[in-house]
Amino acid sequence: MPPDNHYDTKREQEVMQPDSVEALSWLQTPDNLFRTFGGNGIRKGYAGKRAVDFVQCLCRRGAVRVTAVGVVRVQGEYVRHEAIKRGLPETDVMEATDRLVVEIPSESGGQVELINQWANTFGRRMFDVPTDTGQKYLFYWWD
């Protein structure tokens, strides 16, 4: 089955937007901002070490690049409370996204590893698990 060029084109457009950043360096920026992705916002998302571990896991499984897309900045006392509760630096500013775009290698072995990781993350949420169609990207979206 040929790759879905529309799907890859959309992902390529997303990673080029000004609100998109390379995920690991974004998460590890030493500026005391609370950064999170995924899950129903701040409470169930990935933050701190858990977020870094998740992105590093994708890289170990063969991801060429992991991009956080649609990053927004939020400020308020609620952010400070959640950061302290999670043992993260005390701050009232957070950057967050509910989307990651994962560039997968062209070799099918790496694609299988990353597709399996995607299935482990989302399969329980009743999404259709993608198959290896030669696509260049996987899309992680938590709503």
Give the location of each predicted region.
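Secondary-structure transition/turn motif
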Residues: 103-106, 141-143
